[in-house]
Amino acid sequence: MSDLQTPLVRPKRKKTWVDYFVKFRWIIVIFIVLPFSATFYFLIYLGDMWSESKSFEKRQKEHDENVKKVIKRLKGRDASKDGLVCTARKPWIAVGMRNVDYKRARHFEVDLGEFRNILEINKEKMTARVEPLVNMGQISRATVPMNLSLAVVAELDDLTVGGLINGYGIEGSSHIYGLFADTVEAYEIVLAGGELVRATRDNEYSDLYYAIPWSQGTLGLLVAAEIRLIKVKEYMRLTYIPVKGDLQALAQGYIDSFAPKDGDKSKIPDFVEGMVYNPTEGVMMVGTYASKEEAKKKGNKINNVGWWFKPWFYQHAQTALKKGQFVEYIPTREYYHRHTRCLYWEGKLILPFGDQFWFRYLLGWLMPPKVSLLKATQGEAIRNYYHDMHVIQDMLVPLYKVGDALEWVHREMEVYPIWLCPHKLFKQPIKGQIYPEPGFEYENRQGDTEDAQMYTDVGVYYAPGCVLRGEEFDGSEAVRRMEKWLIENHGFQPQYAVSELDEKSFWRMFNGELYEECRKKYRAIGTFMSVYYKSKKGRKTEKEVREAEQAHLETAYAEAD
């Protein structure tokens, strides 16, 4: 370990064939991954158009038929012979760093592949009822032309409703609406016994409603969700604010950009995002919805960031460090998906020249490479290399600890840029897996309200500085230290990422009381794998799965300090 004044000193690392393969992986990406990605995106687009051409009545009829198939499949499972229930989705399709190793053990597949339709957009109730495989690109394409939107639209097009609910989802509007699951009005779940139930905040299944988020699909199978809509305008008026100083100063500049010290709610923007480019420089962005008439007024600049030849968004934002604060108008849907084309800044590692003018104009229209195809074209050695030499982690920390988190990341990982996105963590009537610090409402900290503590997602996505310099780096050990720091600081780690937590530590980070009560009440034990074991790193044999499920009755979190 090191302290802030004494950085970690690492020896040089001997290169292997994997290093060279990763360095020249762009050849496979250009000639295989990008063409296939573009083809897949086009076919998916045609499928979405076909779905939208159907009447809502037709879509509902198909939905009902597919739900019956799921129920029949579950009821046909022999608990004494068949493995635990998993979806039939292939491991490489998921957008995440986990290997989905639990599917390597014998398991009982239930196919949810047909659940990809928008079932209803209700302008009176201001809700959208959608199936779990509807993705963010699909729903924003359907709603934004109506001047409507989900309250929280995760940035990457391929992220699905089911993943954002069962796992974790955030966006620049989360400082108002909370995480993606906080905007869901109702879940439609098929339970272990084949019963279809509708869970809301205030019906008989309210406990299930609060237990579903972060459960990774281990309480039941999500077949539909009713999600809150908000009214939006055609453009986002975006202000780029450069901030310079040490990491604590950057953190305070970020906090001040959206959380007024006087508590005046009229000063709170519609969207917030921060990017820290190095230990002394960052750019904070605040956005408010704007009409087409306002955007097109003389003197206002419109930036269509979605065009394939445009500079990558994070690099465009970085220009504020040289030219100072500036304002521009971005079409709303293009703003929502501003990080899709370059996958935040991971595109720079995948295609080192992908941000160059010539590439953007000639081949930029093929971007981004589909994450699932990137995973499908890497073997075990490459996958392990990324786990060891690369970081893709999110640290959810209380807002007042953002500066400490930035210092920790700099000291232990030295990864830049760093993404900052605030979100409310609501004090719920029933405590779920994640929850605010006890007594936060009495501290009157900047950004907090009576019903929610303000948190921030500190997004760490890139190769550490020591790896870029050819030095040694132990990715597993770094993640273990990160998880320890999060537990000590009442933070949380989204489980789409690779986790090194043992079971006891997992239930120190997360609250398992409601989850375990629902596992027993709705008979998920013996049918669905536990959330810890589903998130656990490494291969799993059928014997291990069975033993873990048996041991789950004596939960590790009951022993937690």
Swiss-Prot record:
Q: Does the keyword DNA-binding apply?
A: no
Explain what the record says happens when changing G172E. In dwf1-10; dwarf phenotype
What superkingdom does the record give? Eukaryota
Q: Which InterPro entries match?
A: Diminuto-like (IPR040165), FAD-bd_PCMH (IPR016166), FAD-bd_PCMH-like_sf (IPR036318), FAD-bd_PCMH_sub2 (IPR016169), Oxid_FAD_bind_N (IPR006094)
Q: In Gene Ontology terms, what is a biological process of this protein?
A: plant-type secondary cell wall biogenesis
Any single GO CC term annotated in Swiss-Prot or TrEMBL for this entry: endoplasmic reticulum
Membrane-crossing residue ranges in chain numbering:
26-46
- Write the Enzyme Commission number(s) for this entry: 1.3.1.72
Q: Disruption effect? A: Dwarf and reduced fertility.
Q: Which Pfam families match?
A: FAD_binding_4 (PF01565)
Task: Provide the catalytic activity annotation.
Answer: lathosterol + NADP(+) = 5alpha-cholesta-7,24-dien-3beta-ol + NADPH + H(+)
The record's listing under PROSITE patterns reads: FAD_PCMH (PS51387)
| SUPFAM superfamilies noted in UniProt | FAD-binding/transporter-associated domain-like
Q: Where in the cell is it found?
A: Microsome membrane
Please name the top-level EC class of this enzyme.
oxidoreductase
FAD-binding PCMH-type domain location is: 49-232
Enumerate the UniProt keywords alphabetically: Calmodulin-binding, Endoplasmic reticulum, Membrane, Microsome, NADP, Oxidoreductase, Phosphoprotein, Signal-anchor, Transmembrane, Transmembrane helix
Residues in compartment: Lumenal: 1-25
User: What happens upon changing G282R?
Assistant: In dwf1-7; dwarf phenotype
Q: What are the protein's GO molecular function terms?
A: calmodulin binding; Delta24-sterol reductase activity; FAD binding
Instruction: Provide the function of this protein.
Output: Plays a critical role in the general process of plant cell elongation. Involved in the synthesis of campesterol, an early precursor of brassinolide. Required for the conversion of 24-methylenecholesterol to campesterol and for the conversion of isofucosterol to sitosterol. Necessary for both the isomerization and reduction of 24-methylenecholesterol. Regulates indirectly phytochrome-mediated light responses through the modulation of brassinosteroid biosynthesis.
Q: How does it assemble?
A: Interacts with calmodulin.
| Family per record | Belongs to the DIMINUTO family.
The protein here is known as Delta(24)-sterol reductase
Q: What is the lineage of its organism?
A: Eukaryota, Viridiplantae, Streptophyta, Embryophyta, Tracheophyta
